[in-house]
């Protein structure tokens, strides 16, 4: 397999994948194909080698097993971002925060609450990326998908995506690959509604109100930095996939039972199908504080945010999974609540 057969895409052999992920763990790929244009990406996906290849973009929401034999990886690195009539179109490999900055530079509001989230634009619809009261489902206009079963690519609408809390039809699909995403934004330059209390207070705005989008971005970045959620190479608290678990949604009865069993308030938020609990609160109150299990551990909970499982510089995937499993099991034992991993686990399970 050569680059000429893949519209010029670079092909490398025996490439360590750990440096290509924010958690910095993973195997050595037998073959790495880097597609820097949509043409190259489609060519790689249509080639026989691409049918079962692992798709990797920003590497910020994936945990790769330590050993995966005979692995071919297609690295999504197409990165063009264009703006027209309030529509931002981003190729799948575009850096997500660059998409946010581009929107703001054109006076467009709607993405600012999602500032500082690592990863690529193409990953955002897969798990309906969200933070601080916003999610990409609020603004996605359409998504261009390649179907590895048929070799076709088509634009689909949000209605086709079945967006939910940190999920979509793409999250558990091995055949649909995002090529491009379009976002329909506020041409009046208004921010998204500020639904998240901590963010609204930081901006001195009533919950549900709006603010200058640039000011919202600055406030979001400050909050994320305080939790070790903005990538910073020297800061090992940022060597993670962000929040390792999603906030669980429980029934009203479960919430009432939990509130009766603990001292003090239980952070919770209304959800369409129940009550959403703060996973970080559950983790800490199950006995897993920031920095657990201690300084000498290769994988630890972040010292800033107990929901992030971090690599302190020499962890393996096995170390990360073992810690995440301990936390999950501890929360289940303490509260009877099951935490669900937020990142995609490849070749490994909890």
Curated annotation (Swiss-Prot):
GO molecular function list: FAD binding; UDP-N-acetylmuramate dehydrogenase activity
UniProt KW keywords: Cell cycle, Cell division, Cell shape, Cell wall biogenesis/degradation, Cytoplasm, FAD, Flavoprotein, NADP, Oxidoreductase, Peptidoglycan synthesis
SUPFAM superfamilies, per database record: FAD-binding/transporter-associated domain-like, Uridine diphospho-N-Acetylenolpyruvylglucosamine reductase, MurB, C-terminal domain
Assigned GO CC terms: cytosol
Lipid metabolism found in the keyword field: no
Listed EC numbers: 1.3.1.98
Reaction it catalyzes: UDP-N-acetyl-alpha-D-muramate + NADP(+) = UDP-N-acetyl-3-O-(1-carboxyvinyl)-alpha-D-glucosamine + NADPH + H(+)
UniProt-listed InterPro entries: FAD-bd_PCMH, FAD-bd_PCMH-like_sf, FAD-bd_PCMH_sub1, FAD-bd_PCMH_sub2, MurB, MurB_C, MurB_C_sf, Oxid_FAD_bind_N
One GO biological process term: regulation of cell shape
Group of enzyme by EC: oxidoreductase
Record: active site: 166, 243, 342
Cofactor: FAD
Subcellular location: Cytoplasm
Record pathway: Cell wall biogenesis; peptidoglycan biosynthesis
Residue ranges occupied by any FAD-binding PCMH-type domain in the UniProt entry: 25-194
Family: Belongs to the MurB family.
Function comment: Cell wall formation.
Name used for this protein in its record: UDP-N-acetylenolpyruvoylglucosamine reductase
Organism per entry: Mycobacterium sp. (strain KMS)
């Amino acid at each position: 397999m050569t680059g000429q057969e893949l519209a010029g895409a670079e092909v490398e052999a025996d490439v360590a994948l750990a440096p290509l992920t924010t958690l910095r763990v993973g195997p050595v790929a037998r073959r790495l194909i880097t597609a820097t244009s949509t043409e190259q990406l489609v060519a790689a996906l249509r080639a026989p080698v691409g049918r079962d290849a692992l798709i990797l973009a920003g590497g910020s929401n994936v945990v790769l097993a330590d050993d995966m034999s005979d692995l071919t990886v297609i690295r999504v690195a197409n990165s063009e971002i264009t703006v027209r009539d309030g529509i931002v179109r981003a190729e799948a490999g575009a850096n997500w925060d660059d998409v946010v900055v581009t929107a703001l530079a054109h006076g467009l509001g709607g993405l600012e609450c999602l500032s500082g989230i690592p990863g690529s634009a193409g990953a955002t619809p897969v798990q309906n990326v969200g933070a601080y009261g916003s999610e990409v489902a609020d603004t996605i206009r359409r998504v261009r998908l390649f179907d590895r079963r048929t070799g076709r690519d088509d634009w689909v609408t949000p209605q086709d995506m079945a967006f939910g809390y940190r999920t979509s039809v793409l999250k558990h699909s091995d055949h649909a690959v995002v090529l491009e995403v379009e976002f329909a934004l506020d041409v009046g330059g208004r921010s998204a509604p500020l639904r998240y209390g901590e963010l609204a207070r930081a901006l001195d705005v009533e919950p549900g109100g709006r603010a200058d989008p640039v000011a919202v971005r600055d406030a979001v970045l400050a909050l994320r930095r305080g939790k070790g959620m903005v990538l910073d190479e020297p800061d090992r608290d940022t060597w993670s996939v962000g929040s390792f678990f999603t906030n669980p949604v429980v029934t009203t009865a479960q919430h009432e039972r939990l509130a009766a069993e603990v001292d003090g308030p239980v952070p919770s938020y209304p959800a369409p199908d129940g009550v959403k609990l703060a996973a970080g609160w559950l983790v800490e109150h199950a006995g897993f504080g920031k920095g657990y299990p201690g300084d000498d551990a290769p994988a630890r909970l972040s010292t800033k945010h107990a929901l992030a499982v971090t690599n302190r510089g020499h962890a393996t995937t096995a170390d990360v999974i073992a810690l995440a499993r301990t936390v999950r099991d501890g929360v289940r034992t303490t509260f009877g609540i099951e935490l669900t991993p937020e990142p995609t686990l490849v070749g490994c399970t909890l």
